[in-house]
């Protein structure tokens, strides 16, 4: 067996991916400067030099999101993990959540709600059209006990963009916090987290940021974090529990070890 493993290792070729111009719904082309940055020497995720870079990364993400939210950070996993970070922390068993579906990723939001024990109230629009503000307003009036409004800002599956500013205003008028999918929209279209009073938002580095896949920028305001801190039940995911992650990524945190961050990916 040992000789077979050795033979396999000797015959394996280094992978040389073909050069492509990426035009699909997945990753975008990555600039050579970013690829070069990821090839730099690996240092520890608690190294003072890396901690300094973490602070710079947070500030850069704040600018892109147009926010001063203290908890603005990159989740060490792709955009789907950013989505789960929002729902795992903000949805408790029995919570009623109004979720807008006008494409694939609204459907994924609904699945997250049910997996975390929430009750999904669906507002459905035709694929390729924007989320109807009138339908959302009616759904919230019909469900005054709803705690969250969740919607996709720009649906990757169709390209349809919805009025995030108006939807957030409707949510707050009905005492709901908002979860916004900005995987496709961040850095690609106007997005103002603070001005539009978005409570929780997630994105991905592989779309309009034209960076490597595998990182999910997220941002939470104080209204969202208050709900996280006041949960009656523990967050079901240890890895995504913001109460733990804030010790590493939170503003003024001691950078307490939680998990090994993807150091070289964050260089990019």
Can you say where each PLM-predicted feature lies in the sequence?
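A glycine-/small-polar-enriched, mobile loop at the entrance of the PLP active site in fold-type I
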Residues: 19-76, 80
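Conserved beta-loop-alpha segment that forms the PLP phosphate-binding cup at the N-terminus of a helix
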Residues: 68-98, 102, 106-111
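General beta-strand structural signal in soluble alpha/beta enzymes
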Residues: 22-24, 73-76, 99, 122-123, ...
């Amino acid at each position: 067996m040992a000789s077979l493993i050795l033979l396999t290792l000797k015959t394996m070729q280094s992978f040389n991916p073909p050069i492509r111009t990426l035009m699909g719904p997945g990753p975008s082309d990555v600039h050579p400067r970013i690829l070069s940055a990821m090839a730099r020497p690996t240092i520890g995720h608690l190294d003072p030099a890396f901690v300094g870079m973490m602070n710079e990364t947070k500030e850069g993400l704040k600018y892109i999101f147009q926010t001063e939210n203290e908890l603005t950070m990159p989740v060490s996993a792709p955009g789907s993990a950013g989505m789960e970070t929002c729902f795992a922390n903000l949805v408790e068993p029995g919570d009623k959540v109004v979720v807008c579906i006008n494409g694939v990723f609204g459907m994924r939001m609904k699945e997250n709600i049910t997996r975390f024990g929430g009750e999904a109230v669906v507002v459905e629009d035709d694929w390729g059209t924007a989320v109807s503000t009138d339908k959302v307003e009616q759904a919230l009036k019909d469900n005054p006990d709803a705690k969250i409004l969740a919607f996709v800002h720009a649906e990757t599956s169709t390209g349809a963009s919805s009025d995030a500013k108006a939807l957030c205003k409707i949510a707050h008028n009905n005492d709901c916090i908002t979860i916004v999918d900005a995987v496709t929209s961040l850095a690609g279209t106007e997005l103002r987290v603070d001005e539009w009073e978005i409570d929780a938002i997630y994105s991905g580095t592989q779309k309009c940021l034209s960076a490597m896949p595998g990182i999910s920028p997220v941002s939470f305001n104080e209204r969202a974090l208050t709900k996280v801190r006041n949960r009656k039940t523990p967050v079901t995911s240890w890895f995504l529990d913001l109460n733990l992650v804030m010790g590493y990524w939170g503003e003024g945190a001691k950078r307490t070890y939680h998990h090994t961050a993807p150091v070289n990916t964050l260089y990019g």
